[in-house]
């Protein structure tokens, strides 16, 4: 069989057309030109969710990307996360609105992020300088996924930042149907996700590794929802409220991920998962499927995901966050010392917190005053991004040790 030069040219043109570089300018428009030819991908939310879970996006570990995209080179996990986030958001848009116009989607998603984040920090005005919506969105998605290579190492990025990215998708779905109170909804979804993770870990046979992560989640809740003082199980009542099926499936998968991170499932963990699934209104077959899916995912990818190879996930999770916060404090030590010198009450309360528990009112003061400081120091903006609240307890724990001169005059006697 003979092939003409024109035949090879057609093959090359087709392959080249489906290529995409998610780190080069224009990648979102390229994604749009490809995805508009793939409308059969988005038939219902159930299949869309399953596809996203199979890539690892739901778990915060992006191992694959949609099959209609051919990367020009081996992609980093951040690059896969960018593609999967856009894929997840666009699929949600087409299913919720019955509109597949990509330009309209870009305008809507840009509007969504602006409404959701503009009250948190002034960083948007600095990063959204593109002349087109797609160019602006490229910068915004880069910020959502990477938060800057100077701030985050890849392991930290995949474990904490990307594991919360699916909340963006759930919020976007809510925003499309009812845009009011979207910030309150964001706070609630984060609160429920962290509560579920905490209680899933608490259902395990206690070991030091799991306790470190559980304590981290526990203390972070104070800053996510200041009127909740502890994990007393009241979050379960909110799960009984009328939540979307996609939210409920995500909550269950987060719990399964937490209990399976040590590659085993004990009776009490299984009991927690099935009890949670029942509260979420999910059928037993789906609960079993969720457990089996995370097991298969871990087995399939344990050799390629660094923190699944050797270390307990809780250890890696906590240690990488601590290293990263440590580095941020030291890099910004002079600016922080200046701010602390002007915030005597904050210094006093942080010193006090090293010896005894603060009251809810005191914790709220610490939160608000720290947020004001973070807003004034651009390189600390990560602490006020969605999901960044989980870092605050580590910051509060480390800063007296790393900047002792700022706390000497306010040392609390035991």
Model-derived segments and spans:
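Transmembrane helix boundary and interhelical junction motifs in multipass membrane proteins
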Residues: 384-395
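Small-residue-enriched hydrophobic alpha-helices in membranes
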Residues: 5-258, 267-379, 396-413
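DG-centered beta-turn motif at the end of beta-strands
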Residues: 262-263
